[in-house]
C-alpha cells in the first residue's frame, strides 16, 4: 500500500475550512473513489493554523502514480475555491496500517 500526503494552508476561518470539507465530500471523493487502486482518504484539520493534511491511500505505487493527473486537478480546484494553497505533496510506502475510525 502507498500513501500520498498533501499539506494545504491558507484557510482563513472555520467557514472556508467547512466549505473545503464539503467540496471534498460532494465533488472530490466521488471522483477519487472511481480511480483504480484507491484504498482510502483521511483529512486532518488544524483550524488554529488554517491547515489541512490529506492522506490518500493506494493499493500500489503504480496506481498511485497513475492517479496523479486527476488528483492534481482536483487538489488545485478545491484549494482555489476556498483561497487555500497546496504547500507540499509527498509520497510514501505504508509500513503499518491499522484504522478503526468512527464517524465524527
Language-model features: locations:
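Short S/T/G/P-rich N-terminal loop/turn motif that feeds into the first structured element of a domain
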Residues: 1-52, 59-72, 80-104
Amino acid at each position: 500500500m502507498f500513501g500520498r500526503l498533501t499539506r494545504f494552508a491558507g484557510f482563513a476561518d472555520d467557514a472556508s475550512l467547512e466549505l473545503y470539507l464539503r467540496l471534498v465530500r460532494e465533488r472530490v471523493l466521488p471522483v477519487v473513489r472511481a480511480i483504480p487502486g484507491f484504498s482510502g482518504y483521511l483529512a486532518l484539520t488544524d483550524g488554529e493554523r488554517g491547515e489541512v493534511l490529506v492522506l490518500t491511500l493506494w493499493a500500489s505505487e503504480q496506481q498511485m502514480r497513475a492517479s496523479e493527473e486527476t488528483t492534481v486537478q482536483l487538489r488545485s480546484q478545491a484549494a482555489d475555491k476556498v483561497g487555500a494553497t497546496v504547500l507540499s505533496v509527498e509520497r510514501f510506502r505504508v509500513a503499518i496500517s491499522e484504522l478503526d475510525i468512527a464517524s465524527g
